[in-house]
């Protein structure tokens, strides 16, 4: 397994590299955005995961994350940053990161999160779910391709990030079931100690903008007051009594 660590603090970068190498990983280092993107572009074999700082010279980690996502929606990205505000985390997730850890950090937790992301990449269908859907799934005017990470509506094609696709897959696999926010965090994010339930809401809003004709009055991803969400692939024309917070 090959890891790219993007970190401008040389001592920290080298310390991380040493510890991951002790675990059997192949590690490359980059100290800024252009270096990281060039390293990714020229990699052979390709990298299996990126560990990314946010405060980098010249090009922020957010920009790097977006650039990576334009090239590869499936490559796992773990942000490791001293930024602790919820706004920073939300911006990182909006840019496409899969996990977010703050500095200072516990090395065993970092190693565990990396293993978790790599395992999920190797076995994307091995989830604690009811029934795994086929490679393609259709509901309403929405067509989902789980292999290409594409979502198609009548007029638009959306390239989903790994987390967006895993969240949508999770909803589809639990069609009709009420899911709590903490349950979603546990099963989709895996190790959510740095994730807030608000992050779940933000990702739901993004999915709604893609799949709902009117995101303010959703028909497929319904809010359940005080609990979480319920996905309905084929909603009743008159709505559902559990939909008590239409636009939340």
Q: What is each model feature region?
A:
Residues 2, 116-178, 182, 233, ...:
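Short, Lys/Arg-enriched segments at the junction into DNA-binding effector domains
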Residues 2, 26, 76, 136, ...:
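Residues at or immediately flanking beta-strands
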Residues 23, 73, 140, 217, ...:
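Residue-level signal for beta-strand positions within conserved beta-sheet cores that form or flank
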Residues 43-44, 72, 121-125, 175, ...:
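A general structural signal marking secondary-structure boundaries and capping sites
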Residues 150-220, 225-227:
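Positively charged, aromatic-enriched patches within helix-turn-helix-type DNA-binding elements
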């Amino acid at each position: 397994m090959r890891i790219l660590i993007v970190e401008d603090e040389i001592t920290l970068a080298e310390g991380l590299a040493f510890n991951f190498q002790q675990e059997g990983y192949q590690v490359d280092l980059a100290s800024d955005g252009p270096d990281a993107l060039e390293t990714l572009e020229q990699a052979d074999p390709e990298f299996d995961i990126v560990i990314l700082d946010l405060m980098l010279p010249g090009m922020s980690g957010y920009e790097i994350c977006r650039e990576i996502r334009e090239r590869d929606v499936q490559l796992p990205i773990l942000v490791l940053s001293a930024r602790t505000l919820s706004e920073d985390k939300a911006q990182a997730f909006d840019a496409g990161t899969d996990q977010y850890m703050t500095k200072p950090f516990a090395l065993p937790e970092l190693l565990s999160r990396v293993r978790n992301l790599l395992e999920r990449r190797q076995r994307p269908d091995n989830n604690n779910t009811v029934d795994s859907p086929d490679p393609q799934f259709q509901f309403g005017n929405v067509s989902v391709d789980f292999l290409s990470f594409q979502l198609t509506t009548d007029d638009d094609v959306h390239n989903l990030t790994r987390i967006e696709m895993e969240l949508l897959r999770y909803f589809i696999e639990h069609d009709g079931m009420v899911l709590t926010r903490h349950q979603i965090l546990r099963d989709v994010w895996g190790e959510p100690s740095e994730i807030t339930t608000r992050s779940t809401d933000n990702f739901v809003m993004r999915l709604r903008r893609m799949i709902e004709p009117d995101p303010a009055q959703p028909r497929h991803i319904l809010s359940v007051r005080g609990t979480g969400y319920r996905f309905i692939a084929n909603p009743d024309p008159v709505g559902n009594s559990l939909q008590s917070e239409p636009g939340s």
